[in-house]
Amino acid sequence: MKRTAKMLTAALLALALALPGTAAAADDTPAVRISEMMYKNHATLQDADGDFSDWFELENTSNRVVRLKGWSVSDGKTVWDFPADATIPRGGVRVVFASRKDKTAAGESHTSFALGEGETLYLIAPGGTIADRAACDPELPADHVLRRENGGELTESVWATPGYPNTAAGYAAFCESRKTESPLVINEAAVYNDTFALKGEY
């Protein structure tokens, strides 16, 4: 039954996109939008499984908590529903991995589809209206993102900030979060073009 419902939703989405004047989200729908997206994630953000999966970030621009029950995302072919208990705090963000893993575990949500070059990510509000969309630019280099800054349009950037504000301070905070404590440190490095012999203790 659930599979049939998803297939029907995908069919209706495809039909809606083929028609002129595709409906936007209703005025009373909470203001949720796609705030950042990376679909060539080679070395930026690992999921709990250690994989560098595609990912996108949703931003709640309203002054209330948004419950994502009834919300879904799609690549135009497959529709993935948010877990009934998923939320975004007011003024906050939620990172979702587009990994084809179709699971929610370890505090992470994974869609049943991945993002590909030339595809479009759709954010679908309850009732089937399209709240937002973002196209995957095939020319975007690896580990670059599309993100909004100061509430503007999605633009290319080298500064990924998943889970943090799309600002210089947010990028610094994201970089800081990736640091790990280790007893091992690099205390010397050199590059030599010629062979050499080691003498003494080493």
Identify what each model region corresponds to.
Residues 1-12:
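Bacterial N-terminal signal peptides that target proteins for export
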Residues 13-17, 23-202:
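Intrinsically disordered, low-complexity linkers and terminal tails enriched in Ser/Thr/Pro/Gly
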